Structure formats: structure tokens, C-alpha cells
């Protein structure tokens, strides 16, 4: 009871599972679940498949670009998913924002080359005070600076619109919020 929010009279459980292979969702009455992984700890098929070893999990959806798994953006390539797929990625927020527009432009006019720029809240990889960092720009105090950095958005677009990624460059500006 202490591990749940009651929403519209139904419990939504917070189930701690440090080792996904040992998680037992059936103990909470959960069977054939779609597990949504936004932990950041698992990013490829091998790691994400650990969730499928837990009791009660049928499919896994990653909320970031994944390696070795289909990266799906609704309105772009959702028809590529088959019912037999058990692990898929919903790509990234940037990929979901730009891919539908790029698909329409590319399909109707073609794209020779382009640049993607995303403005994003600073992340936990940045320092809160000016400090050393392997990527010197990220060493700037996150809450006080706009930091230009790289993003994998161009490569991620290529996973849902094949051939387009080689035509795109991309960068991100991490900003205080």
C-alpha cells in the first residue's frame, strides 16, 4: 500500500527492482506488462532483455534511443513494429519533435543537408558549479550558463528515416531552467 499511488481508485505501484531479472510483478497482480524503462541504466537489447526475465513482463519500451533495437517515432515509422517485437525504443524527445517534420519535407522536396539545433534543460552530466569536466564546456556551472554541446539527434533520426542521418549535423544548447 505504501508503494502505490491511488489514481481514480486504482493502485499504480512503485516497484523497486535493483535487479530486473529478479523482479516479480505478478506479486502485484501485473501480468503481460509493457515495462517502460526510463532509468538510463539500460540502452541496448542485451541489457533491456533483463526486464523480460522478470515475472510478469511481456514487452519493454525504452524512452531513449537504443542500440540494436527498433527506434520508433509515431507518424514516421510506427508501422515497422511487428507484434513479435518485445523490445523497442521510443527514440528521444528531440527525435520525436523533428522526425515527423523532416519526413514530410524529405518525402515531398528532398533534403540535401541540414543542421538540427535543440534547446534542452541542463542534465545531471553537467557540473552545478564551474569545475573540471572531460568536455570543457560541460564544466561550466549548469544553472548559470548556456552550454553548447553535441547531441546524437542526427544519428537518431537516421534510425527512423534511413539515409537522412548522413545529411544532418546536430548540436544542443543546455540551458538553466
Predicted ranges, named:
Residues 1-128, 132-135:
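N-terminal Rossmann-like NAD(P) cofactor-binding subdomain of oxidoreductases
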Amino acid at each position: 500500500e505504501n508503494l502505490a499511488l491511488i489514481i481514480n481508485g486504482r493502485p499504480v505501484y512503485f516497484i523497486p527492482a535493483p535487479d530486473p531479472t529478479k523482479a516479480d510483478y505478478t506479486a502485484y497482480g501485473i501480468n503481460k506488462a509493457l515495462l517502460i524503462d526510463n532509468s538510463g541504466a539500460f540502452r541496448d537489447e542485451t541489457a533491456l532483455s533483463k526486464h523480460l526475465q522478470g515475472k510478469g513482463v511481456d514487452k519493454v519500451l525504452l524512452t531513449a534511443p537504443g542500440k540494436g533495437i527498433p527506434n520508433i517515432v509515431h507518424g514516421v515509422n510506427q508501422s515497422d513494429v511487428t507484434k513479435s517485437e518485445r523490445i523497442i525504443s521510443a527514440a528521444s524527445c528531440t527525435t520525436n519533435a523533428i522526425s515527423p517534420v523532416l519526413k514530410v519535407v524529405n518525402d515531398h522536396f528532398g533534403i540535401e543537408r541540414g543542421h538540427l539545433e535543440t534547446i534542452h534543460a541542463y542534465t545531471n552530466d553537467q557540473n552545478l558549479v564551474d569545475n573540471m569536466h572531460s568536455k570543457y564546456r560541460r564544466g561550466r556551472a549548469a544553472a548559470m550558463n548556456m552550454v553548447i554541446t553535441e547531441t546524437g539527434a542526427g544519428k537518431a533520426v537516421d534510425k527512423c528515416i534511413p539515409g537522412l542521418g548522413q545529411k544532418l549535423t546536430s548540436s544542443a544548447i543546455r540551458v538553466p531552467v
